[in-house]
Amino acid sequence: MVVIAALLGSLAVLAFLFYLWYLTIFIIVHKNQQYLEQTKALYNKLKLSNFNSVIVPFQLLRSEKKALEQPVKLLKSFQESFNSEINSALEQLLVFSEPKALYNCFWFNRNIKLLRKNLQGLHDKQQRYVKLTKNAIAYFDSSYDTLVFYRQAFCLLVSFINDFLVHKYDSLFYLNIINRISLLFKDVELHIKNKDVKQQNQALNKLHNNLAQTIITASRQYFFDVKVGYLNYHFQILSQKVTQLRSMKNKAINSQEVAKFQELITNIGATLAECSQALGNINLALCEQRINQAKEQIDVLSNAVSVKEKAISLVVSNVDSFLKSINHYQQQNALLQTLMKEIELMFQNNLDTVNIINQINEHSLLIAQKTQLLNQENALTEFIDYEKLFRLMSEAMKLLDGLKNLLNELFALSANKFDDYRFFVYTLDDFRFKFFQIENLIANEELIISEKTLKIISQAKHQFDDIFTQAKNDYEGAFSYLNEKVRFFQNQLTHVIVDVVGLMNLRSMCKHTFIFANKYRQESPQINESLETLTQFYQQQNYSETLSGLISLLGKIKSSAKQHHLDLN
């Protein structure tokens, strides 16, 4: 049995070692397989490199065959070397891909790393090669892109000219330009086809300059054409407005204003005609000058018409609305006068308030007079002097503005006075309430107050009543009197509070002292007799004498206890 057990144990150890060996081989082979796949991926990436797309542009860029002969030889030499190394790498990869190679761990690991290093170096060379040659490729490809871009721009330019300019202006001018640009396109295409870079660049520059200049000319002519059209339209509207102003009756516009408007219209018409002529001749510099000149002239005319329209709108169109507003004010004036009387009665002794109310009454009277004149002038049927009507309206508006300012000033002053009055009432009520509280406290506590304190309370109450009565008839005087007496009333109130509170504090201390002294009432007839006497003082509210007697009695009790070696609680 022992031998069998030993054999089984040996077999188990061998099995474990075999499993461990198998696992190690599996991991190494799997790792080699991954490394091989990575190397194949790098090889495939390099294999896709196409150097013909780089070499051909260099061959096409030279205008003479020997100009780039040496660079092209170097490029081809690099291509042959690159292809040779790629093919060699392929042969090695085929060997490494065999199954038995994966299990030759040390050999595989050493050689695959060497191949990977060679491929990485080849990749770096390829990147430097591309970096050195990409500018030439970009230049070669951009020639076609530039030509296509210019062709598209030229087509758009031709469409723009046909749509907006040819039917109005000199078509022969643009026809010659279009033909010249078309010939330049043919020259560029020919030079690109012949791979003549120098001539190609010269032709492209010439094409660019002609195309850009034509675009600028066409766009400016169109822009000026739109401007002139807008100015003509605006001028036409202003001319119609001037005609309407001239056709209005009465004094809407006088002869001097008519002459001024006519002079402006004549000058603007001549300037706009010069603008159109300069556009037709494609004299854009002169056209721009005349456009600016016409714009300034139209601005002057527009401002003059606008000012006149606003004046007429204010005087003629809105005169009824103004009269309705001012007549409505006259209807509300009775309410305003009633309010003024109330304010005057309340602040009759205040000089500032009275002066403002007098000014308001004067303004109200003048506004009533202006309103009557306006109604009379507007009621005329045959002829209305709008200048006079406008003057009356302006004067009435100034009076209304002045009245508004006076009312705001009066209301602000009244609000301040009301704040003063509210402070006056609050202060007086506060004093009365505090004295009332003290009276209630004296009554509730049944305190015997000194005659002086009672007299102060009584006099203060009567003074407060007198101030309230005075305020009904003379608020200013009552307010001034209260301001003068505030400190006096405060001192009187403080005196009363100190007297009452002091009396209550003495009574409270007497109560607490009696509680302690009564514990020793039965200790001695003398103590009992003294406490009876002090109780009579307390009932008579002679708290000061009571407290002094209690303190003296407690001192005697303490001394007696100390002599007899007694402990007091």
Swiss-Prot record:
The keyword Membrane applies. It is a single-pass membrane protein. It is found in: Membrane. One of its GO terms (cellular component) is membrane. Keywords: Membrane, Transmembrane, Transmembrane helix. The chain crosses the membrane at residues 2-22. Its main location: membrane. This is Uncharacterized protein MG397 homolog. It comes from Mycoplasma pneumoniae (strain ATCC 29342 / M129 / Subtype 1) (Mycoplasmoides pneumoniae).
